[in-house]
Every structure is written in structure tokens, then in C-alpha cells.
A protein has these predicted regions:
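Positively charged n-region of N-terminal signal peptides that target proteins for export
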Residues: 1-6
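Bacterial N-terminal signal peptides
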Residues: 7-16
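Outer-membrane beta-barrel proteins and related beta-barrel translocases across Gram-negative bacteria
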Residues: 22-479
Length: 479
């Protein structure tokens, strides 16, 4: 047993040493145990252990650690850090003047300087809330008692034994609820109202709006935006008849959702639905189209155009404006997606193709990345936490390249890998063969990690056998 272990240790040292020698101490591989790469010119070092499972990497001032899929951490010299544990279970982010963490986004702590984007709030949703806003500090223990500022689209929310009592405030309007949602009183500057839902309710603000309902949602009457140049009147006996009128837009609905007509005088188009949302006809200059779902749909809305063929089989979304061109083709929602985008002002370009679960492809400003497989990335296309912690576990093949011909390829987490940069080329199929070419005059080929190794350079040629550091040398300086 000891002799076998000693032999394995000796072979491991020889194999790693031969690899390092071949690459000027910038590369050492022993698949799948470890993979070490470094570049002094790029200020870069990377170590991977057990394929994609463990990672330690430094890039300039930033250091990354990963124990996939359990743990990921990135930190820089200024103490800014980001940590994920079994994403999305736990996450932590630290800036110079703020700190936040979350557990499943239900337990969240976020405190620091508002200038850094911190909300200065903590909560265990939906039970406990604590924070500080411009109005002051707040705390709440739902449904017992508490006050919230700037939550759920309201300036203030207060409650006691909810739904027994609750109060909301928004833009000067206060609503006191008793046995929510059944009874409420509305108050504010020049504003009053009440409701006994769903029987009857009314509210009004002088010169701004008037609202009434009876047997909600059957009968309701509303006068809205009275203080603007586009006031709106709404009358309804739902679902039999609904009328909406304003100087810029009018609509009529009969037996909702079967028949409706919308006339938009501001944007100069007319739309008929019969029934909504299956059949729709739109006529106008910048707004026009025909929809007959699930067979066909082709609708243009100013700079946007949307088409369906055999919904939900094939969909095309397009946007063409002075600033951007964007097109997305989709098959069965997330099964296949192809996005093309160009920003005219900056010249930035993007191409992204996802074919779930087989592969993903992305090209950003001429730099391409292809990976196989793609299990969850199509559903969360810009999620960096998934990219860092989960994606490397199932990406059995990756390739990156640019328009200058530089290329990096990895198969089965570097069982086979290749790198090309300018005239320099290196590749390896572990443990059979390893090859490097720095120029037309310099090359290095090794079999079984150095059992047989042949080098050619400006100083001549050399053959090494059996992992030995000395060998047969001939050529220019052989004598």
C-alpha cells in the first residue's frame, strides 16, 4: 500500500512539474484534480480543484472563491464583497458604506448610506419590518401592530390587529380601513369618501376626481383627472356595458370581453376586439395590425412590432428607433430564443441564442461565448449568481473567441482544452498529449505528461524521456 502511494505521489509530482516547465510556470494540470493557470502580464491567477467544484482566482485587485454549488465569494482590495451560499438561499453584499444580506429574499437586512443605494430596512416577510426613511424610523409586526414608510406603493401604512384596522396614505390621501376590505373612510385636503364594500362606496376630491360604485364590480361611475387637459369619464354596468371618454381617447365595451372598440385620437388609431384578447383589428398610421389567436398575430405599435404564429409556438418581437434596433425570436417561450440588439449611439451590439437545455450562445461587441449545456440560463438570462455558482457544474463544453482569432476551448472541465492568442497556440488532451507553439520557430509537444517530450526552439532541438529534466539536445547549440 505504501509503495503504491509513493509511486502515485512521485508520478503526480513529475506530471505537474513537466506541465509547468512546458509553460514557463504559468500552467499546471492534473485532470480532474487540479488546474492552475497564471499570467503576470494580465495580473491573473486561477486554480481549479476537482473540475468545477473548487475555484480560487485573482484578477487584478479582485479575488474570487467558489465551492460549487455551496459557496461563492468575490472581494476586492477596498473591502467591497459579494457572497452567495446555495443561491438563492443566502446572499450578502458589502460596499464601502453599506451592507446587505438576505435569506430567500424573505429575511433581508439592508443598511448603509442612501447614496450607495441602500434602503436602510430589515424585514422577515411578511411578519417583521424595521427601517428608516425620510419620514423617520418605523417598525411593524404583522398582523399585530406597526407602521411602514414607502412600502407597497404607499407613503405610509399603519395597522392594528389587521384586518381589524388598517390605514394607508398616498399623495395626501388617507384611507382608514375597518375589517379590510369591507369598510373604509377616505379623507384628505378637499377630499372625502367612504365605502361599504361591495354594496356601495363614493369618494371625491374637489376639482380632481369623483368616484362611485354600487354592487361592485357591476355599477360604477368615475370622473378622473379633472385638473388636467385630458379629463376622463367612466360609466359601467359590468359586464354588459362600459364607456370611457376623454378628449384624447374613447372606448366602448359590450358584453365584456366579447366586443369592444377603442378610438385613440392622440395616437390616431382605432382598435376593435371581438372577443378580447383573441381577435383584434387595429387601423392607423403608426399603430396597426391583425390578431387572430392562436393562428396568427401581426401588430405594430409605433417603433415596436410583435408577431405570433400558431401561439405559443413562434413569436417575433421587434423594436426599431433612432437609438436602438432589437429583435427577439422565440419558440415555445423559453425552448428557443434568439436576441439581436444594436445601440446606434454607442455602437454596442449583442447576440444571444438559447436552446434549452442544450446550449447557449452570446456575442457582445464581437466577443463570443458558446456553452453546452444550458439548464436554467434561458429562464434567468442575466443572473450573475447562477452564472458563477451553478452554471459551471453542467457546462460540459465551452468556447470563447473574438474577431482577431483568439480562442479558448474547454471540454469536460479541461479534459481537453486549447488556447490561441495571436501566433501562440497551446492545447492538451489529458493525459495523452500536450502541445504548445509560441512562434513558427518554437514549439513543444509532450506525450503522457512528459514520458516523451520534444522541443524545438531558437537554441536547437531537445528530446526528453521518462520525465527526466535532461535529454538529447541537437541543433544550433548542440555542441
Amino acid at each position: 500500500m505504501k509503495q503504491g502511494f509513493s509511486f502515485l505521489l512521485m508520478l503526480t509530482i513529475l506530471w505537474s512539474a513537466s506541465s509547468a516547465l512546458a509553460y514557463d510556470a504559468t500552467l499546471s494540470t492534473l485532470w480532474p484534480l487540479w488546474d492552475y493557470r497564471a499570467s503576470d502580464a494580465a495580473d491573473y491567477k486561477s486554480t481549479h480543484l476537482l473540475g468545477p467544484l473548487l475555484k480560487y482566482e485573482t484578477k487584478g485587485f479582485e479575488t474570487e472563491y467558489a465551492l460549487r454549488p455551496l459557496f461563492y465569494r468575490a472581494v476586492d482590495d477596498e473591502g467591497v464583497s459579494e457572497t452567495d451560499v446555495l443561491y438563492p438561499l443566502f446572499g450578502h453584499k458589502k460596499e464601502q458604506d453599506s451592507s446587505s444580506f438576505h435569506i430567500l429574499r424573505l429575511l433581508t437586512f439592508d443598511h448603509g448610506s442612501p447614496a450607495s443605494g441602500s434602503r436602510n430596512r430589515s424585514y422577515l416577510f411578511p411578519f417583521f419590518f424595521y427601517g428608516e426613511e425620510e419620514q423617520g424610523k418605523y417598525k411593524a409586526f404583522f398582523p399585530i401592530h406597526g407602521t411602514l414608510y414607502n412600502w407597497f406603493g404607499r407613503d405610509r401604512i399603519s395597522f392594528t390587529l389587521f384586518p381589524l384596522y388598517g390605514r394607508t396614505e398616498r399623495k395626501g390621501t388617507r384611507i382608514d380601513n375597518v375589517l379590510w376590505p369591507f369598510f373604509a373612510r377616505i379623507s384628505g385636503e378637499n377630499e372625502s369618501g367612504f365605502k361599504a364594500w361591495p354594496i356601495y362606496g363614493q369618494s371625491q376630491k374637489e376639482g380632481v376626481y369623483r368616484k362611485k360604485f354600487f354592487l361592485w364590480p357591476v355599477f360604477f361611475s368615475e370622473s378622473l383627472r379633472l385638473n388636467t387637459d385630458n379629463p376622463q369619464e367612466v360609466r359601467a354596468a359590468w359586464p354588459f356595458y362600459i364607456r370611457k371618454d376623454s378628449p384624447k381617447k374613447s372606448s366602448r365595451t359590450i358584453l365584456w370581453p366579447f366586443f369592444s372598440k377603442v378610438e385613440n385620437r392622440e395616437k390616431e388609431y382605432v382598435t376593435w376586439n371581438a372577443p378580447w384578447p383573441l381577435v383584434r383589428v387595429t387601423k392607423g398610421d403608426k399603430y396597426h395590425g391583425l390578431k387572430i389567436l392562436p393562428l396568427f398575430s401581426d401588430e405594430t405599435m409605433d417603433v415596436k412590432r410583435e408577431r405570433w404564429y400558431l401561439w405559443p409556438v413562434y413569436k417575433i418581437e421587434e423594436m426599431n428607433s433612432e437609438l436602438i434596433m432589437r429583435r427577439r425570436d422565440r419558440v415555445l417561450f423559453f425552448l428557443y430564443s434568439d436576441v439581436r440588439e444594436v445601440k446606434y449611439e454607442t455602437g454596442d451590439s449583442l447576440r444571444r441564442i438559447d436552446f434549452w437545455p442544450f446550449f447557449g450562445y452570446k456575442n457582445v461587441n464581437g466577443v463570443s461565448h458558446l456553452h453546452v449545456l444550458s439548464l436554467v440560463e434561458p429562464f434567468f438570462p442575466n443572473n450573475q449568481s447562477i452564472e458563477r455558482l451553478w452554471s459551471p457544474l453542467w457546462r460540459v463544453y465551452q468556447q470563447k473567441w473574438d474577431q482577431q482569432g483568439n480562442r479558448v476551448v474547454s471540454l469536460l472541465w479541461n479534459l481537453y482544452w486549447s488556447e490561441k492568442q495571436g501566433d501562440r497556440l497551446a492545447w492538451e488532451l489529458f493525459p495523452v498529449i500536450q502541445y504548445r507553439k509560441d512562434s513558427q520557430a518554437e514549439s513543444d509537444i509532450s506525450f503522457l505528461k512528459g514520458l516523451v517530450r520534444y522541443r524545438k526552439g531558437l537554441d536547437g532541438k531537445q528530446l526528453n524521456l521518462f520525465y527526466l529534466p535532461w535529454g538529447i539536445h541537437w541543433g544550433r547549440d548542440a555542441g
